[in-house]
From Swiss-Prot:
Chain residues that bind NAD(+): E76, F77, F78, P79, P80, R81, T107, W108
Known catalytic reactions: (6S)-5-methyl-5,6,7,8-tetrahydrofolate + NADP(+) = (6R)-5,10-methylene-5,6,7,8-tetrahydrofolate + NADPH + H(+)
Binding site for substrate: D173, Q241, Y334, R338
UniProt name for this protein: Probable methylenetetrahydrofolate reductase (NADPH)
Protein family: Belongs to the methylenetetrahydrofolate reductase family.
Record-level GO BP terms: methionine biosynthetic process; tetrahydrofolate interconversion
Organism annotation: Caenorhabditis elegans
């Protein structure tokens, strides 16, 4: 190898592995394919509302749901303290939001340097990441007591630039040891007025309500009148401070309605998750915990599990009462960045509604103000959606309906932060457990790919649930089962597969393996394969395609620095590889192959070899040398079989290339 002086990686083609059949028939749906394997977790449900729509402002969505008498929930989070905690945090937000959260919000945490958009863990940066990567409408808390008007307007402009269109306007807590007269003395009412004066109706504005009155207000009645002033100034809805008794919220709502507050009032609920934590939070909020709750907690205060069980059950009981009697249109849960008990509460209340539909083969960001109309993506980022979002973050519009004849798609660079910190796998140790602490030869590399496809444990008993080119630790996609035998064959023969899809000819849109879109439709796919292979094999492959399949098979082969770059596709014409036909709709083509986008993907695909694998080993080690040799010597190749109605020839073409190379 290049780094160790050993034989080159390409000698792996010495012995060609065989299987009974490389041909794969077009898939027509699980009901007609007796060989299709469907996991129990896959459902046959499809989307009721599947097409992209114009963005609906948060307060408009809340009002619509209330008018339709649909109960809903929302979730509050605070920013993670450390950069390496961001991936786990975003995963947690995404998992919880998949239960149907109408919105999530992010606190204005002064310790995070909240307005610093250059700091990964700031409130502003995390809110933008929640919106972009989790695809759920995100409201940013914003305080003004520490700032002047110019500062606050700057913060609002930053929020607008990041795509955020919902603000929870707050005065904010005074810094410890600070009196109100020592600050700028601006309050939430001032911010609400500034927003409406400067931005009109661009933002949805939430404001805080205090069911027992703000602790610094002259009186409960005075605080109610101040809340009415905030609503009259332009606040669209109210989210309350935490409380401990259902009666407290019920009285508060009655009192608000009596003085003419008509905006939706959403109860803010904090489940008791720990004895000391709830006492600390109550003290910070200047609230008294009812004596009967303290009495209940006293005998179990040292048993964390018992306290959490009590808190969960009490929360469910209180929320159910408020929802059943119609006082609360929804529930806003203060999650404290926890997941388990929050999910249990929502399921018990019947609010958890796991979405079973796929609007597109990739996750549609229907609640994103800008991406909500996006309907087409290049296939290369199928398993790295966060990367795609990062690299297209600065786009002010997204392809809708068709990718079009592109001349220069402006993909941003993947920053070193993204490469190292926004991945899903926790750390190098986890990855090495999957890939192997020692890579002695190319055979070890092939085995990693094979174990990923088969999901068989490796020699150390660890499953390979992720590759450098995938973000989610979920293993292969369900549709991979249709071609898994052929993919294993590829990797056994040194053709390292990183992306693929089988041909599909009119599978129902409700199909559990490949279905997407509106019910009553039909889905189609061209067979696609993306892989790394030796230069010699790619040369032979190109010869065979140009000789025997010049029209049927499109290829694109490229090396790490583009000194080799060859394709038989039109340079600026994309190829639709996934499309659907649905009742009353235009044909949708959500996934394409595009030569110019592929060149942008090439940089990232090669970087992943080292950033997410090779660099975990010492540079002088054999393991590093093996990975570096593959990175340096192998070409990245894509193949498209344009005839989706006949058995795919992609694997047969690869077999021919291997056979001719062997001669």
């Amino acid at each position: 190898m290049t780094n160790t002086g050993e034989t080159k990686v390409i000698e792996s083609h010495g012995t060609i592995k065989k299987i009974d059949s490389l041909s794969t028939m077009p898939y027509c749906g699980v009901e007609t394919d007796e060989n299709a394997v469907v996991e129990e977790k896959i459902t046959l449900e499809s989307g009721k509302s599947w097409s992209p729509k114009h963005y609906e402002l948060l307060h408009e969505r809340i009002e619509r749901l209330i008018d339709e008498k649909q109960q809903f929930f929302s979730l509050e989070f605070f920013p993670p303290r450390f950069v390496n905690g961001v991936p786990n945090f975003l995963e947690r937000v995404e998992r919880l939001s998949e239960g149907g959260s109408v919105f999530v919000d992010m606190t204005w945490h002064m310790g995070s340097d909240p307005a610093n958009v250059d700091k990964v863990t700031s409130s502003s940066s995390i809110a933008a990441s929640m919106l972009d990567y989790c695809g759920v409408d995100t409201m940013l808390h914003m305080t003004c007591v520490q700032y002047n008007k110019a500062d606050t307007l700057k913060h609002l402009e930053q929020a607008k630039a990041m795509g955020l269109r919902s603000i929870l306007a707050l005065r904010g807590d005074l810094p410890p040891g600070t009196e109100l007269e020592d600050t700028h003395q601006f309050r939430a009412l001032d911010m609400i007025r500034w927003i409406r004066e400067e931005y009109g109706n661009y933002f949805s504005i939430g404001c805080a309500g205090y069911p027992l009155g703000h602790p610094q207000a002259p009186s409960y009645k005075a605080d109610l009148m101040y809340l009415k002033a905030k609503c009259d100034a332009g606040a669209n809805f109210v989210i309350t401070q935490l409380f401990f008794e259902a009666e407290t919220f019920e009285k508060f709502v009655r009192d608000c309605r009596e003085i003419g507050i008509t905006q939706p009032i959403i109860p803010g609920i904090m489940p008791i998750m720990g004895y000391e934590s709830i006492k600390r939070i109550a003290k910070l909020s200047q609230l008294e915990i009812p004596q009967h709750i303290l009495d209940d907690l006293e005998p179990i205060k040292h048993d964390d599990d018992a306290v959490q069980k009590y808190g969960t059950e009490r929360c469910i009981e209180m929320c159910r009462r408020l929802l059943d009697n119609g006082t609360a249109p929804s529930i806003h849960l203060y999650t404290m960045n926890r997941e388990g008990s929050i999910r249990e509460i929502l399921k018990s209340l019947g609010l958890w509604k796991l979405e079973g539909d796929r609007v597109f083969p990739w996750k549609n960001r229907s609640q994103h103000p800008i991406r909500c109309l996006e309907s087409v993506r290049p296939i290369y980022w199928s398993f790295r959606p966060r990367s795609y979002i990062t690299r297209t973050r600065d786009w002010d519009q997204f392809p809708n309906g068709r990718w079009g004849n592109s001349s220069s798609p402006a993909f941003g660079d993947v920053s070193s932060y993204y490469l190292s910190n926004l991945t899903t796998v926790r750390n190098a140790d986890d990855r090495l457990a999957m890939f192997g602490a020692n890579i002695e030869s190319f055979e070890d590399v092939k085995r990693v790919f094979i174990n990923y496809i088969t999901q068989a444990p490796n020699a150390d008993g660890v499953k390979v649930t992720v590759l450098p080119w995938t973000e989610a630790e979920t293993g292969v996609q369900p549709e991979t089962s249709l071609i898994s035998e052929q993919l294993v064959w590829c990797n056994e023969n040194g053709i390292l597969t990183v992306n693929s899809q089988p041909s599909v000819n009119g599978a129902p849109s409700t199909d559990p393996l490949v279905g997407w879109g509106k019910p009553g439709g039909y889905c189609y796919q061209k067979a696609y394969l993306e892989c790394f292979m030796t230069a010699e094999l790619s040369d032979k492959l190109i010869q065979i395609i140009e000789r025997e399949f010049p029209v049927r098979v499109n290829y694109h082969a490229i090396n790490k620095d583009s000194t080799f770059d060859k394709t038989n596709s039109e340079e600026t014409t994309p190829i639709a590889v996934t499309w659907g036909v649905f009742p009353g709709s235009e044909i949708a083509q959500p996934t394409v192959v595009d030569p110019l986008s592929f060149r942008a993907w090439r940089d990232e695909a090669y970087q992943m070899w080292m950033a997410q694998w090779g660099d975990f080993y010492p540079k002088e080690s054999k393991s590093y040398g093996v990975i570096k040799a593959v990175h340096d010597e192998f070409r990245l190749v894509t193949l498209v079989d344009n005839d989706f109605q006949k058995p795919s020839v992609l694997f047969d073409v690869l077999q021919k290339a291997l056979d001719e190379l062997k001669k």
